[in-house]
């Protein structure tokens, strides 16, 4: 099995292998009480039950393995998911690629004024072009410096060692890795990295990876979307505010309009939590 799709200018996602399927999850769950495989519909219902009630061990019986080419700054976010096994291309042993990520103009935005780790909007096209050109010029200078440090035949000593020459490369430089993870933790990765709050570049990779895995475990993927990815979690304070709304207002639309009045009641929610609650109720 090999599925491949290009991502961005020089990257790609390849689904190299997958061990197990929906039936593997159901079989692993049923071994707890000694019953064998049942029908597909029974298996689907069981898988949905497992995901809904957070019985995660059976999902760990399925594993997926990818070959990825991605910018170093995206690789750093991927490596944060420590339950995965990975092996990365080595700049000590080999010469790094000349490929560097240059964002498309529609990806170039100013820093958000409300989110310290996100992008805003409203940047003019002229500034987008200037920023893109600066990124492109800087990566060209870095690659030129890298080539110089590596040396050539005219340098008697053969150039600087690879492990030090690579230090001038930008985090936009592309690297490659093999990445293997069980399905439970893969879904956790997808929930975080496909979220709108994640950096757009890691979102792009995560969405491609998920769409490749989805047809291989349709029941588990359906349950993930229903009970995890598209679900909404409520805190105790949010539930208190919601119960207040149901008792005090005829409908949710009226409650949202009058939410400022409800905010005067001490539910223990910060201003940001109030804003998040409104978004959940819309």
Tell where the protein language model's regions lie, with residue ranges:
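Family-specific signature for flavin-dependent thymidylate synthase
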Residues: 1-282
């Amino acid at each position: 099995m090999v599925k491949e799709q290009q991502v961005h200018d020089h990257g790609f996602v390849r689904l190299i292998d997958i061990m197990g399927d929906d039936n593997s999850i159901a079989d692993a769950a049923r071994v707890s009480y000694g019953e064998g495989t049942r029908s597909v519909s029974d298996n689907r219902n069981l898988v949905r039950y497992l995901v809904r009630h957070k019985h995660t061990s059976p999902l760990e019986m399925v594993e997926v393995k990818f070959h990825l080419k991605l910018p170093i700054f995206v690789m750093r976010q991927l490596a944060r998911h420590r339950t995965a096994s990975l092996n990365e291309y080595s700049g000590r042993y080999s010469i790094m690629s000349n490929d560097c990520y240059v964002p498309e103009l529609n990806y170039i935005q100013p820093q958000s004024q409300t989110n310290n780790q996100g992008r805003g909007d409203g940047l003019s096209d002229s500034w987008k072009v200037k920023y893109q050109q600066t990124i492109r010029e800087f990566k060209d200078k870095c690659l030129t410096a890298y080539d110089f440090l590596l040396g050539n035949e005219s340098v008697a000593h053969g150039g600087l060692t690879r492990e030090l020459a690579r230090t001038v490369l930008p985090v936009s430089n592309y690297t490659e890795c093999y990445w293997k993870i069980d399905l439970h933790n893969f879904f956790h990765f997808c929930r975080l990295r496909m979220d709108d709050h994640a950096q757009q570049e890691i979102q792009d990779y995560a969405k491609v990876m998920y769409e490749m895995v989805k047809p291989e475990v349709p029941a588990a993927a359906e349950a993930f979307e229903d009970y995890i990815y598209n679900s909404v979690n409520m805190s105790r304070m949010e539930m208190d505010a919601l119960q207040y709304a149901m008792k005090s207002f005829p409908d949710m639309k009226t409650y949202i309009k009058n939410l400022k009045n409800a905010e005067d009641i001490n539910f223990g929610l910060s201003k940001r939590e109030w804003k998040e609650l409104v978004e959940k109720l819309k």
